[in-house]
């Protein structure tokens, strides 16, 4: 048997531990009273007088003395007779008016306070005896106190200073009470609220106080309540925890005590200060492996008897910067006394942690004891205490242990709402047997919660949230902000079955129960579990009082078991029912709420409720049975009200509509994963589309023919051709660029419109617009017919490749333009050895074909042909002489340069004035490389192209090196200048022109003046490297250092560094293809 009992006890402990570890869930209210129902309750707003119709109450405190409720506010104290039953308004029967003097208000304004603060807010209202009451007010930041008679509220005596008895500001908290004829007060004692003090004054003996500016005693406290118990006076407050400073700024709840017979210390230690001041922490927390604390005390009750034990009940909240949460904890006075008899806490150094003081280091008599009591019974007064005891209590006022709550857990918690609980009032003798404890808790959202408390640790049931009441009246209470909805205080009037709920601007009188709401439905009445309500013998639900035991009643407060009861089939009252009263009427005591069983058409959210849970909810199973119709019909419109004379069929059970938390988490996680997968696929497909597009463009660009195969070299001036150059197909032969400069008899249109001639018929991409164009290439001088034969043969050899690959035929510039610096071309094609014509490369057929082309495309005079032929012969002879000199190792370079200059002079063309045609203007760098489709017939044969007999123009030096392609039959001599002429580190690299080319301007020796971007720049000769191809098979020329004077650059205006890539329309000259 003993073994069985031991096992049962162990099992009970294990179950209790498991229950303690789990965090308590918020209870759903069994009944809800919304604003539509609570707005009928009487409201107190203060009595307007004269021009104070808009006067705010500015509630400060209320106190019940016998059958009178005293309400203190700004400048006034009201009295309300509790025996009167108010209907819509609570009317005070008396009023005490105490306003600040004009001088005090002016001084308050001079201190920088707002005029609304410069009033007399009543902060202390403490009865001294049955006839007199001690009243203190802020008096425009100059606190003063008076005595008044309780019966008449008449001023009696003189004003006394309210310093250390009343705060300066109405927003500062304070407490006060009389014990043994002495006033104990706790407040701030200065204008800046920096000197918090617990003070004793009046009566016999000297005034005592806490040590000034000592954070170990009190640090930024908010005093909430003071009670007298035994030989001590207890103060409940919250403050900044000094033992928690190393970990951050936190607020802890405290209880402090002092002896009523404390006389202060000796002249050496603690003179005129408390010698018995001790404080301890109030621990309101949820137990478990890691405690969850509710550290901030908001309100606490007087000492009440809970199961015969003196107890105080308080409401606690989480830290202000934490998640909102509230709890109700009860503390027995015995546990508080036990903590004060325990160990002390100390901090040896400012940086060390707080530890417990060993018992052997605690002096005798024990600090905190009262003289002539207990361990200090041998001492008559506290002045006789030894200095060691006084010094110890001065530096060790904090106890090591915290006061635990009853049952080591809160009675009630509320953590899943956005508001905190702020006020509390307890009825510890509720029910017909007065054995239940009902707690009323106010919140900062204007709600009042009615809780049936679990007061016994052996009870199998937890606390039950009976009702949730929306007490704040929006219509009658003037709310300037959300703070005005906060419940400041609760006052229980059990004799008149009422609760007074105080807000800053009004006070609402609420009955403790609403038994009439359940009507004649027994199941609803029993399921409410309200200790104030019971099923009466008359067949209705009504309020149960201790005097009704003999009459008989039925209730089940512990469990609310209604399984043996049937469903309610109540005939609801209608508007034609004699005892029905209009909703909101001033004489209605049976008005209907939104959660009541009796539904009203004016409250659309009403739904049938299951009796055992009694929560309002909209359901689709709601049915109404009409009296005249025996058949049941579904009421499909829940928001249209209820017809007259209906019978409500309450469902016997309620299906759980809640979704399990695991299912909800799984669905959320699955939705997240699915969404992430879909998003990833979409991003991948979107990116892949662009990657494929970029690859296609890249392949098209790679397949394009490189333009480095061109045999011509182009010069780049003034930042031209900045855009990247793309290559063309490799099979375009080298001399094509020299042989495609055809001319024709066709002239440009007068308007110069060439939009249709810009794009190639094969749709070449516009990226090639930055390549040199024929507009940027000077007109090559006409060759002899024999020279053209060699080109014809070469063109005939490459005919097949020309048919397979796209060709471009840039158009020639307009021929008739005046000669000036602005017309000097910015890019020229330099001659090389392949442009010299040898008889070994020609035959008669090619000569005839070339001659035919020349006769068709270039009608020239015979004199010009002979002159060109003679000039070609002279240039060939001069070149042969030059080669001989170069091959001669004993030749003098200076002599060679002189010969070159003489050759240039001999090869000069006719004077500028006699030219029939002038060189073209400088083209735009964005001109397209593609010839317009209209310039060349689609099926035209491949032709050797010659140039018109236009006199040459001065050549410019090269700034850009073009890549070129060599094959077995042709070699080109190309040189480039990698840096600009005006670059200080640049070395001019140039190529010696062919001697047989006519039309070059003579190159003077010495320094030249070059035009760069329209500005004359002095250019000095610099050494250059050149390479020339031999005209014969005698090998290549030796690479020698040759100097050449820089050519004149065009006098053109500067061009932007970044120009658009798209080719612009350029007019074509008369030489078309």
Curated annotation (Swiss-Prot):
Residues 684-1073 are cytoplasmic. Residues 931-942, 980-995, 1021-1037 have a biased composition (Polar residues). GO terms for biological process: axon guidance; negative regulation of axon extension; negative regulation of smooth muscle cell migration; neural crest cell migration; positive regulation of cell migration; positive regulation of smooth muscle cell migration; semaphorin-plexin signaling pathway; smooth muscle cell migration. Residues 27-512 form the Sema domain. Residues 1-20 form the signal peptide. Pfam families: PSI, Sema. The modification Phosphothreonine is found at residue 773. CDD domains: Sema_6D. Disulfide bonds join 108-118, 136-145, 259-370, 284-329, 477-506, 515-533, 521-568, 525-541. The keyword Kinase does not apply. Residues 744-775, 787-825, 839-874, 914-1005, 1021-1073 are annotated as: Disordered. SUPFAM superfamilies: Plexin repeat (SSF103575), Sema domain (SSF101912). Residues 790-805 have a biased composition (Basic and acidic residues). This is Semaphorin-6D. It comes from Homo sapiens. The lineage of its organism: Eukaryota, Metazoa, Chordata, Craniata, Vertebrata.
